[in-house]
Amino acid sequence: MARVTVEDCIDKVDNRFELVLLAAHRARMISSGAQITVDRDNDKNPVVALREIADEHVGPEDLKEDLIHSLQKYTEVDEPEPEAVPMIASGDSSGGEDSDVMLDRMTEEELLAGLQGLVPPEHTDDDEG
């Protein structure tokens, strides 16, 4: 089979720069163990990637999406919108009602049980006088 050049693939991807980026990304995928969809014919990975694009075994849009995803340093995760943050901020400035905010509180029985568990001091200055 004749060698594939960029001109053979330009009808699949209009921009030559984008074609080279996509073929290089596909070649890296092949190097890392991705399944080849055409016969290798003793060709190197970039040529195999160009042949896959030319024969439309691999879609340019899929490659482009995968390339963009691989280059992203931050992947966007859908999270609930922060509606609670303005409510907390407005609660602090409205006079500080404690009824909505429940902090670490002890009941009277828990406090008495904790005090009974304390060991009294052996000797204090108040005991002598």
Curated annotation (Swiss-Prot):
Belongs to the RNA polymerase subunit omega family. It is an enzyme of class 2 (transferase). GO terms for cellular component: DNA-directed RNA polymerase complex. Promotes RNA polymerase assembly. Latches the N- and C-terminal regions of the beta' subunit thereby facilitating its interaction with the beta and alpha subunits. It catalyses: RNA(n) + a ribonucleoside 5'-triphosphate = RNA(n+1) + diphosphate. Keywords: DNA-directed RNA polymerase, Nucleotidyltransferase, Transcription, Transferase. This is DNA-directed RNA polymerase subunit omega. Its EC number is 2.7.7.6. The keyword Nucleus does not apply.
